[in-house]
Regions:
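Internal, Lys/Arg-enriched amphipathic helical interaction segments that engage polyanionic partners
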Residues: 72-200
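Helix-loop junctions and short alpha-helical segments
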Residues: 158-220, 234, 238-241, 245-272
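Short, mixed-charge amphipathic alpha-helical segments
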Residues: 202-207, 270-305
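Solenoid-repeat scaffolds in large eukaryotic assemblies
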Residues: 229-231
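Extended alpha-helical coiled-coil "stalk/arm" regions
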Residues: 33-91
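Charged, amphipathic alpha-helical stretches
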Residues: 1-56
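Charge-enriched, short contiguous segments at helix-coil
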Residues: 290-359
Length: 371
């Protein structure tokens, strides 16, 4: 992409962002995002304190006393624990004694109340942000724009992570190659910006830290012309996201074995999305992403490079001669997969936490009535 072409592309994108309705949507989403980040920080600070307190207590023998050494789903463990507590069953005495001897009951109780409030505020902030983004996608994305997104997706360029229609894909003279190359222009500044929020996370979990390291590594290899190495890393990132997405409710209602086959994972993801029927955007995107990724796993994707020859090092194959744009397309696919995964995991977490606190509240009220 020449400097003149990028300048034209950039100026057209700026014109779109300056439209009053789009500028307002971006401003609103930015404020809601900042609020959600602040609420998330508060939630995780309290969660970390609770984790440290709970893990400072000697709980040896508690599990055997309450559950008899049974391996139970998370929800079933909660139900059994509440039933024992309501009946003042002697089985729960071991836990009561451990808590009493720790001297931390009052502090933990106060923090649990703070955590419930912080969790509620966090979820509410995320729902507001999610709703604002959905409104933008519904009202600001014209049918012509949506059709162009689908046309691009059919050619392996997925831009469904856009929250406002500011990529100038409808502008005269802008081609699909221009859009891909816009991510690599100027030392990959646009691509790095796209993935910046991964790098900017405070105190990420060990798994998230490793994933971020691989994202940085993939972009770095891409920038230095090491396309096959970058592609292998992105294939690993895609595989990880597919697994995480499919396992969002594992071991909650039933004990689930972690599925290893792509087809089984895809079926689980579809089941989870079917349970979130009010959110149609992600279901539509999944209907596009799923067959594409399935074809990639089976080395049948016409719009993407051959995965098997890259992963298994078939150095006699000409399919190993890949380009910069091939890797960018994979990274864009990963961003779309990550968007779907985040959505599913967020709403599954909301479901789990809502059920937990609802059932605890019901148990407390029933015990009061029984006295």
């Amino acid at each position: 992409m020449t400097f003149e072409k990028y300048q034209y592309y950039y100026n057209e994108a700026v014109k779109i962002r300056q439209k009053p309705e789009i500028a307002l949507a971006i401003e609103n989403q930015t404020k809601l995002s900042e609020d959600a980040q602040a609420k998330a920080k508060k939630r995780y600070e309290i969660e970390d304190k609770l984790y440290e307190l709970y893990h400072s207590i000697d709980v040896k023998g508690v599990d055997d006393s309450i559950f008899g050494g049974q391996d139970l789903p998370e929800h079933e463990r909660l139900i059994q624990l509440m039933e024992l507590w309501m009946k003042d069953d002697p089985k729960i005495n071991v836990l009561k004694e451990k808590l009493a001897n720790s001297g931390l009951q009052e502090e933990i109780g106060n923090l649990e109340n703070e955590y419930q409030n912080a969790l509620y505020e966090y979820f509410l902030a995320l729902i507001k942000l999610d709703s604002a983004i959905n409104d933008s996608r519904e009202n600001l994305f014209t049918q012509e724009y949506k059709d162009k997104l689908k046309e691009y997706a059919d050619k392996g360029v997925l831009l469904y992570f856009l929250e406002t229609p500011d990529a100038p894909i409808l502008c005269e003279g802008i081609t699909i190659d221009d859009v891909i190359e816009s991510f690599s222009f100027g030392e990959f500044i646009s691509l790095k910006t796209l993935f910046y929020h991964f790098v900017a996370q405070e105190n990420p979990s060990p798994s998230m830290r490793r994933k971020t390291e691989d994202i940085v590594s993939a972009v770095d290899c891409l920038e230095h012309g090491q396309y096959r190495t970058a592609a292998r890393t992105v294939f690993a990132l895609l595989e990880s996201e597919h697994k995480n997405c499919s396992a969002a409710m594992d071991n909650y209602f039933t004990l689930d074995k972690r599925v290893r086959k792509g087809k089984q994972r895809a079926e689980r993801i579809q089941q989870l999305l079917d349970g979130l029927k009010e959110q149609t955007y992600f279901t539509k995107v999944w209907d596009i992403v799923n067959p594409l990724y399935r074809d990639i796993l089976n080395s049948k994707a016409e719009s993407f490079i051959d995965r098997n020859s890259i992963i298994h090092g078939d150095y006699y194959s000409e399919q190993l001669d890949i380009t910069e744009n091939d890797v960018i397309k994979l990274l864009l696919l990963f961003m779309n997969m990550r968007m779907i995964s985040d959505h599913i995991q967020l709403y599954c977490e909301m479901l789990r936490e809502s059920l937990k606190y609802t059932e605890i509240h019901i148990a407390q009220e029933l015990k009061k009535e029984a006295k």
